[in-house]
Structure formats: C-alpha cells, structure tokens
From Swiss-Prot:
Organism in which the protein naturally occurs: Salmonella agona (strain SL483)
SUPFAM superfamilies registered for this protein in UniProt: Xylose isomerase-like (SSF51658)
Cofactor binding note: Binds 3 Zn(2+) ions.
Source species, domain of life: Bacteria
Name of a matching Pfam family: AP_endonuc_2
Protein name listed in UniProt: Probable endonuclease 4
Length: 285
C-alpha cells in the first residue's frame, strides 16, 4: 500500500498538521516539529504531545505514515568543532521531540564540508553525529535525505549515502529518503521508465532498498545533472509524469511515506489524487 501526502504546515499547533493532511486526501504527511529556521524551541508540553497523538488517531495516521523533517540550520558534518556540537545538540533535540510525539522517523539533510575538510572526513562526521543521537534515543530512525549536491552539500551520490550508513553502528535505525528532484539534479535520470529502472537498480545495489524509509516526490525546475535544487509541480518540470507513475506502480515503494514538496500547495489535493489513480491503474492492469 502506498502512503501518499505532502509536507504540511503545523502553524497554530502540531495537532493541526494531521488535519491539514486529511483535508487534501493524504495518507501520509511530513512536518516540522519546531520552527525550522531557529536553533532553539520551547520543550513540548504534555498537552501538545497529547493533542498531536489524538489528532493522528482521529485522522488515521500511524507513525509509519509520518516523516518529520529537522531544522535546515543543522549541519552534522560541520568542519568547525563548536558549530558541529551546536548541530549535534539540535539534532538530538529533534530526535527526542520525535520520540516524545510517538514518531519513528526523522528526515534530515546529511551535511556540508564547506570546502574546509575532505569529503571522506565530512561523511565520517555525519555518521558519528548519527551515532551520538541514536545512543541517546530509542525507537526513532535517522533518515538521510539525498541532496542535489548544491554548494558543498554531501549526500548527492548513492555512494555517499552508503558511506554514511556504513559508519552508523545501529543499522536498524538508519535509513534514507530519496528526493526525486535532488536525484535528477545530481545526475540520476528519471525521465523514462527505463531510466527509473536503471537509477533504482543502482540504488538497490549501492545502498539497498532495505534502507529506503521515505521519498520526496518532486518534479524539477533545474536541469538534469545541474546540481541545483529547484522543485516543480508533478509533470510540469524536467522529469515529467512517467517517473511518478512508475513509482506508484512499483511495489518496492509500498509502506513508506511518499511526500510532495512541490511548489504549489493549492494543487496538492489534485496531485495526491493523480498519484493514487496511477496506483489503481496498476491494480486494474
């Protein structure tokens, strides 16, 4: 079964996120559990936690259907020790918030070397950062998102994701989220079913589908291999509809949150309905 949704706003309270997801016909959603552009946030109160859990139950969202995203400020591979510690503390707080909310996944961008340390050293720092957070939490999986490779961001090659996973001690609590726009911008072709087969065969060989814990379904304004991260609405960008139809009709993408971060929230309901229809087309066939 496919869990399909979007990254919805939690404005006005975390309990509003499941309601907003239900409004657009979603069977999955992503959210920020705090302001993503601030380092610090007030601790979650028992009332906030209870309200969120009640809302998730009301709208029939289990933890497997929810993919929280951490703060954009965090860099788990930061080359400067003081800044690295600040990021590690913030990441641990994000993991603990998920733990408190009964959530089992935390999606994050791996990190950037800022042209100050070697790629290998940065990847090792990211893995160490994950180990530190996992050792102090229970039940939450660290879900590494592939990047477009903009600037000095790492995680744009499957080999880099595999290297991070290799350095994580508890393999049962690490996974990946593949963003289609990021993959395309990083040079992984998705424009035809044949291209999708080839790209994900490579993913299966290098990373492994056992680590796939979520996806971001985004078309790309950016050009193939441009290393530029610019999302677009499904079918409106340089990837096209075929990739998303192919994903909907492949069982390897069942049972994980498939999240839209496309640029027009006004048509998320339509995009979700379209994705669901592709799944039905498979069943009919």
């Amino acid at each position: 079964m496919k869990y399909i949704g979007a990254h919805v706003s939690a404005a006005g309270g975390l309990a509003n996120a499941p309601a907003r997801a239900a409004e657009i016909g979603a069977t999955a959603f992503a959210l920020f559990t705090k302001n993503q552009r601030q380092w610090r946030a007030a601790p979650l109160t028992p009332q906030v936690i209870d309200d969120f859990k009640i809302a998730c139950e009301k709208y029939h969202f289990s933890a497997a259907q929810i993919l929280p995203h951490d703060s954009y400020l965090i860099n788990l591979g930061h080359p400067v020790s003081e800044a690295l510690e600040k990021s590690r503390d913030a990441f641990l707080d994000e993991m603990q918030r998920c733990e408190q909310l009964g959530l089992t996944l935390l999606n994050f961008h791996p990190g950037s070397h800022l042209m100050q340390i070697a790629q290998e050293d940065c990847l090792a720092r990211i893995a160490e950062s994950i180990n530190i957070a996992l050792a102090q939490t229970e039940g939450v999986t660290a879900v590494i998102e592939n990047t477009a490779g903009q600037g000095s961001n790492l995680g744009f090659e499957f080999e880099q994701l595999a290297a991070i996973i290799d350095g994580v001690e508890d393999k049962s609590r690490v996974g990946v989220c593949i963003d289609t726009c990021h993959a395309f911008a990083a040079g992984y072709d998705l424009r035809t079913p044949e291209a999708c087969e080839k790209t994900f065969a490579g993913f299966g060989k290098i990373v492994g589908f056992q680590y796939l814990r979520g996806m971001h379904l985004n078309d790309a304004k950016s050009a193939f291999g441009s290393r530029v991260d610019r999302h677009h609405s499904l079918g409106e960008g340089n990837i096209g509809h075929d990739a998303f139809r192919w994903i909907m009709q492949d069982g390897r993408f069942d049972g994980i949150p498939l999240i839209l971060e496309t640029i027009n929230p006004d048509i998320w309901a339509e995009e979700i309905a379209w994705l669901k229809a592709q799944q039905i087309a498979e069943a009919v066939a």
